Structure formats: C-alpha cells, structure tokens
Amino acid sequence: MTSLQCPPPDRTRRSLSPTGPKFRESCKSCAASKIRCTKEKPQCARCVKRNMVCEYLESKRARRKPGARLKHRESITTNAHHSPTTTTITTSRTTSSSPSASPKTYHPLNYVDILSWTPTPTLPDSATDTQTGLHCNFDDFLAFSHSTSLLGVPEAGELPVHLTTDFRQLEELNRAPEALDEILQCRCSEDGYQLAILSVVILKVLGWYATIIRPLLGVEAHSPGVGEGTTVRTDSLAETQLSSSFYVDSGQQISPKITMGPPLAYGRESEGKTRMAAQLILSQLHRVQRLVNILCHRFKLHSNREQNPAWNSSTASTATEPEGPAYIEHLYPFSSLVFDQIEKDVRGRLRSLSTELLEMLRY
C-alpha cells in the first residue's frame, strides 16, 4: 500500500530586490497651486487642460533603504574580525605570610599637599547645612593652593628656596590675597582655628615673595641636610639667614640657610627685570596689609571675649566685619598671648619685606 504524501506548500519568499522609487500622489503644478490633483499618469487632467508640463516628483519620505540591514550586518562582521583580542587578567589573593608577595610601594611624604586633601563628609549636605549653618566656598582657594603649593612641599622633594625669576609665578602668587579676602568675608572665619590657619597662609605668602626677590639681590639659598637645620631670624638685607622655617612630614624642623653672594650689578640686563619684579611685589603688599589689619582686628575681638565672656560681638562689629554666629562666641581655642605673638610675627615679616624692596628701589 503506497502512502501518498502531499508536496510541501511553496513558501513564497519576499524578494530582496530593490523596488522602484515612490512618487508623490499630486503632481508638481497641482501641489504648488494647492489644488487637488486628479492623479492621472503620466499627465493629470488639469495639466492636459491647461497645456502644462505634468511632473510627478519622487517622494522623500524617511524610510529604510533596501539592503540597509544587510550592509549593517556586514559592517559588524568586518569590525569583529579586525578588533584586537582582549586579554583577561586574573588576580590571585596573596597572604601576608607568602614570601613571593612583592613589597608595597608607599607614596613618599614629600609629595603630600596639605590643601589638596579634603575629607569626605559622612553626613548628607542637608544635614550638615542645618547643623552648622556655615557656608564657605573654598574651591577657588584650594585650586590656587594646588597650582602654587603654598602649604605643601614641591614635587621634586626639595625645599622651595631657590626659585626662578619667572613673572608667571608672581601672577599666580598674586591670586592668594584675593582668595584670602573671599574667605575672610565668610562667617566661619570668625573661628579662632580659622584665623590661625589664615595667619600661617599669609606668612607663607610673604615667605614666597621673599624667596622670589632675594635671589635677584645676590643672595644664594641652599637647603641643609637632615639634622642641620636651625631657626634664625632676619630683619634687613645685611643679615645672612632667612626668617621663614620649614617643616617636613617626619616632624623635624629645617630652616634654609642664606649666604650673601656678590651684590647685584646695576646697569646690566638683569637690573630692569629685578626692579620690575620688586615693583610688582610692592604693589601687591597693600592688599596683604589689608588682610593683616582684618586679622589683627579679629584677634582683638577674641581677646575681648576672653577677658569678658559676657561681651557682645554685635556691639563691636563693623560694616566690613560680619557678625559671627552666637555659638562661636564662647569658643577660645587660643589665648590672647598666642594671637599677640602671631600679630607681631606677621607685621614684622611684612615690615621687613617692604623695607628690603624700598631699599632696593631707592638705588
């Protein structure tokens, strides 16, 4: 008995051959006149009646071009063939007792910048704002300190004593008074800790001004070795050592020694550059003087609070000095003697630098 099998039905496959272009339903003349076209082809009745050229334009509808999907697959295939092979890296855990473990290389302490590190807040921004109420924007000052490393150690690991006489350094250094002025306008600068930090920054700025101008006066500076540092003060050009002292991260104090070199030979090419640098620094010292006056005024406010705890800061505040928060008035982080000594050091350093610049420009 023979079994009859029906032939499989013919599955008509859609032709992938590109179809012809589609034309618009209205001719060009009817579309321009905004009249309903009769849509006869090759010529509509209106164009035949008026003896006009009837032209049907190609439709510009956005549609997928025939064969575009096939080309896309071919491009993906070619890119997969030409792509480089990726290597997988497997990491194995090594215990501290394994002898084959490589020793860890720690970052040297000389590369650490104080102001480049900012602590991560543990509380959300809304919680910290409601608790403290202090809103200070230190972004500009931190960016400036990162570029000039005022409170940090240079990347070379050496003390920044001998500097090149580049006026771009002076232009970057002149941004420090602007940043300090913005910080002093904030209420958080009423705190004694902030005042002490700002005083150290001002001393550092004055020290950098001195290290830029003193090599131009024939003064050579070199850093002593470890264990050779001693702290020595200076007040004029005739003295042989710099007053600013530096501290390394190990806790040992190092102060740069200054040895007098030959005097500056006026009349050479370096004379004009030296005098120009001195005039530029001297023109910026009045801004530093203003910052020192604000700091000293706030030192006196803290001294008055220490002597009289019931003293109200609103009675002594001026238009330029913002009134501090009420909960800061009872904070006395330092005694009045410490602030008096800081004031003497800052004013003495500013007076010494101004005297040196005036003596140099006088001749």
Curated annotation (Swiss-Prot):
Disulfide bonds: none annotated. The keyword Glycoprotein does not apply. Residues 27-54 bind DNA. Keywords: DNA-binding, Metal-binding, Nucleus, Transcription, Transcription regulation, Zinc. GO terms for cellular component: nucleus. Transcriptional regulator; part of the gene cluster that mediates the biosynthesis of the tetrahydroxanthone dimer secalonic acid D. This is Transcriptional regulator AacuR. It comes from Aspergillus aculeatus (strain ATCC 16872 / CBS 172.66 / WB 5094).
